[in-house]
Amino acid sequence: MNLSNLQPAEGSTHNQNKRVGRGEGSGKGGTAARGHKGAKSRSGYSKKIGFEGGQMPLQRRVPKFGFKNINRKEYEGVNLDTLQLLVDNGVITDSVSMTDFVANRLASKNEIVKILGRGELKAKLKVTAHKFTATAKAAIEAAGGEAVTI
């Protein structure tokens, strides 16, 4: 090593970015490598999400559709095969109501329960719920049970 080939130790220096906009003598003065005029040359520039250079953005070109019905009721569905499974496991015997749905985590206490017709119900049950589908009501009554609306 001699004075003609001095260099910093390995890993002691980091790639420092060139300081721009600090006078013509620095080599990066004037426009500070931003080019001439335009939005990108201005201070505080950041491209807005969805901005397409002034072209009408996709989000505004596509038509709007649909709406959220504020009066919509959200039902928690319980199928007949689930009720039959509870009977087979000995959890319920002759009747099932909201307290049973809550106890078996099929619905929470504030939810509206609707009995749906998937599966087969063999047990004679008195089912108490907020709503029934036509097929579910028919299946409960065909098994000798009773469908009671709250």
From Swiss-Prot:
Keywords: Ribonucleoprotein, Ribosomal protein, RNA-binding, rRNA-binding. Residues 23-32 have a biased composition (Gly residues). One of its GO terms (cellular component) is cytosolic large ribosomal subunit. SUPFAM superfamilies: Ribosomal proteins L15p and L18e (SSF52080). The keyword Signal does not apply. One of its GO terms (molecular function) is structural constituent of ribosome. PANTHER family: 50S RIBOSOMAL PROTEIN L15, LARGE RIBOSOMAL SUBUNIT PROTEIN UL15M. HAMAP family: Ribosomal_uL15. Binds to the 23S rRNA. Part of the 50S ribosomal subunit. This is Large ribosomal subunit protein uL15. It comes from Flavobacterium johnsoniae (strain ATCC 17061 / DSM 2064 / JCM 8514 / BCRC 14874 / CCUG 350202 / NBRC 14942 / NCIMB 11054 / UW101). The lineage of its organism: Bacteria, Pseudomonadati, Bacteroidota, Flavobacteriia, Flavobacteriales. The gene is rplO.
